[in-house]
Amino acid sequence: MMGIAIDILWAAIIIVQFIIGNIANGFIALVNIIDWVKRRKISLMDKIITALAISRIYLLWSTFLITLTSSLDPDIKMAVKIIRISNNTWIIANHFSIWFATCLSIFYFLKIANFSNYIFLYLRWRFKKVVSVTLLISLIFLLLNILLMNMHIDIWSDKSKRNLSFSVRSNNCTQFPRLVLLINTMFTSIPFTVSLLAFLLLIFSLWRHLKTMQYYAKGSEDTTTAAHIKALHMVVAFLLFYTVFFLSLAIQYWTSGSQENNNLFYATIVITFPSVHSCILILRNSQLRQASLLVLWWLLCKSKDVRMLVP
């Protein structure tokens, strides 16, 4: 009875976060695309945020549909064809969501951090190429991830066909999701490490800047300091949710033997990550925040008009 109540709670959170995530990411993409059409130009940061929002909508839908399918029919998730489709779909969705967020962290670092190092200055002058090359390199990791996963699925499928005693409850089968999680964790740790490095370098840059400012304007906050703090807020938010995401992977890995009880919990974490972080992006971006306030004001006025029409 307690297990059913917990599952209902996770399912309710998933549905709420799924709706919030689609609204938030759809709003981000719509605002930036409309602004792009009006001005006939778009900044690199807005391009990254728009691509991030679209990739997260894809991630939300793929995670939601995979969770829904496996919950309605627990046996279908062990069918080889379903495993291949669901894993490849989720890998692609998660890959672009994570790497676009990582590119955003790199962008903040190159635009705001202040170092006199030649390599840093070279990368800053060519920050557009840095982002493009980062995405191209990430495609290599994506290809390797998919190939490794499909090879593992083929090996598992061949073993299941040769072994007549192989079943969904067997030890060989319960080892399969653990290896899947291990592969996904290995590849998702790469962009996390890059974002963490950008965060640490931003902190070091801010510390050096504050130390320099002590000689000129002790106790005051200049625009550079404010820019550092704003960038750190954005990167910290991403790393915080990413850390929770990794913890959920670890929990799922060590408790994969009782996978039925953890699927909804894991799906909740995966869906919450792109939903809440996108809401933070809206609040921290002046253009998106202003557009969201205008939409809320319009909805408030509409609701007042409806109330006045109702006798």
Swiss-Prot record:
UniProt xrefs under InterPro entries: GPCR_Rhodpsn_7TM, TAS2R
Record's subcellular location: Membrane
Main localization (coarse): membrane
One GO CC term on file: membrane
GO terms of molecular function: bitter taste receptor activity; G protein-coupled receptor activity
Alphabetically ordered keywords of this record: G-protein coupled receptor, Glycoprotein, Membrane, Receptor, Sensory transduction, Taste, Transducer, Transmembrane, Transmembrane helix
Membrane topology, Cytoplasmic segments: 33-47, 111-129, 208-230, 284-311
Transmembrane regions listed in the UniProt entry: 10-32, 48-68, 90-110, 130-150, 187-207, 231-251, 263-283
Membrane topology: Multi-pass membrane protein
Extracellular side: 1-9, 69-89, 151-186, 252-262
Keyword Transmembrane annotated: yes
Purpose: Putative taste receptor which may play a role in the perception of bitterness.
Family: Belongs to the G-protein coupled receptor T2R family.
PANTHER family, per the entry: TASTE RECEPTOR TYPE 2 (PTHR11394), TASTE RECEPTOR TYPE 2-RELATED (PTHR11394:SF128)
Additional information: Several bitter taste receptors are expressed in a single taste receptor cell.
Name by which UniProt lists this protein: Taste receptor type 2 member 125
Organism: Mus musculus
